[in-house]
């Protein structure tokens, strides 16, 4: 088991699949716009250090519009329009914990409290959803989740939609809580995402295991 994400990345960097993957992403960047930027590709690790993880929210792939993705699943930079899925997440937060929706979509405050906001694909070409999912990111994500499955404290995995549920099928350690539900996208949310109460369930589990709950409120104090 690793002790830091830096150690984990160094370990992966030696593996042939990862060398090929980084080359493929580099080639794609040379030909056009790829999101997020190279500096932000692993920012979920930077903002949520390995020894601080409490919750994992698994997304699919980064937003593919200019200026949106910055390496945290579901999150956008401040000043960027809040995407529809995140608006629905905010609606559920209001129903679940009576937290008013923030006027921005920047989720760094969650990450800094131990919420690992990761996607299963970690890069994407501009305007082409899912364009990098076959580059080798699935192997990388499996390895991240393997580390988390062996984590020494109980974690909560929030899995919205079949893609996330399938991707996390290797999370078998009984100490963890898996919250499985419908994806918050406008196409699916009305089929069971609303009133599923993932945020209060997460905090109840953390408190039960002696861990500090997440302050989900993103409004400027």
From Swiss-Prot:
InterPro entries: UDG_fam1 (IPR002043), Ura-DNA_Glyclase_AS (IPR018085), Uracil-DNA_glycosylase-like (IPR005122), Uracil-DNA_glycosylase-like_sf (IPR036895). Gene3D superfamilies: Uracil-DNA glycosylase-like domain (3.40.470.10). The keyword Zinc does not apply. It comes from the Bacteria. Pfam families: UDG. GO terms for cellular component: cytoplasm. One of its GO terms (biological process) is base-excision repair, AP site formation via deaminated base removal. The active site is at 61 (proton acceptor). It is an enzyme of class 3 (hydrolase). SUPFAM superfamilies: Uracil-DNA glycosylase-like (SSF52141). It catalyses: Hydrolyzes single-stranded DNA or mismatched double-stranded DNA and polynucleotides, releasing free uracil. Belongs to the uracil-DNA glycosylase (UDG) superfamily. UNG family. Excises uracil residues from the DNA which can arise as a result of misincorporation of dUMP residues by DNA polymerase or due to deamination of cytosine. This is Uracil-DNA glycosylase 1. It comes from Listeria monocytogenes serotype 4b (strain F2365). The lineage of its organism: Bacteria, Bacillati, Bacillota, Bacilli, Bacillales. The gene is ung1.
